[in-house]
Amino acid sequence: LGLVGSEMCIRDRYGILNGLDYEEYDPQKDGYIYNHFNEQNFQEGKKLNKARLQKELGLPVKENTMLIGIVSRMTSQKGFDLVAYIMDELLATEDVQLAVLGTGEDQYQDMFRYFAQKYPDKIQATIGYSEERAHRIYASCDAFLMPSLFEPCGLSQLMSLRYGTVPIVRETGGLKDTVEAYNEYEHTGTGFSFANYNAHEMLGTIRYAISVFRDRKKDWNGLIQRGMKQDFSWNRSAGKYEALYEKLTDFE
């Protein structure tokens, strides 16, 4: 009987995603961001936020250059070995800008400092943490990069979706569960993803995202709108916990 019970415990496991505080992270009333917006008027709202952030960071104000955000601990677990491997090629060959915020391992902090000096018009890295700067990156960037080696749930991709910033993620853990890959034929999805923990696969995905941003504005705006309509609030997560407790009670 004990063995049967153990087998049932192993078999009947349920995953419930973290929730996001939709009061704190609300593009319609966030006190940290430059301009408020919602899923109806995001085109103008994000345009204004992007220009203000570019100016604040000392980057050239370019509406049609993709601005990619990174807010993270700078560790290998978060995929920064992949980022380090392709950073020079990405910045040298693509019309792209990066806004980086975080702290972590010295090798990655130094890497971002180096590239910020080498490509001052393309990358600005803040080594440290600022709640205000984090909110502004989520609200102002076009895309958000999160190439984690593993990620049990993750919150940054939920924040980026909430603010209409299209996530580019590796298909692992909670990232795979929360970001639906863009399908150019069915015009579905909320972001871009790559399966293998491989730097050039990540680079190819970033380049694909840049091409959609540049050449398929209708599809890009669809990604933003679908992402903003997702519900990853604590109310949703709490409802799933409640349903699971009810199921367990019925089982007993």
List PLM regions with ranges.
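Nucleotide-activated donor-binding/catalytic signature segment of Leloir-type glycosyltransferases, i.e.
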Residues: 94, 99-136, 193
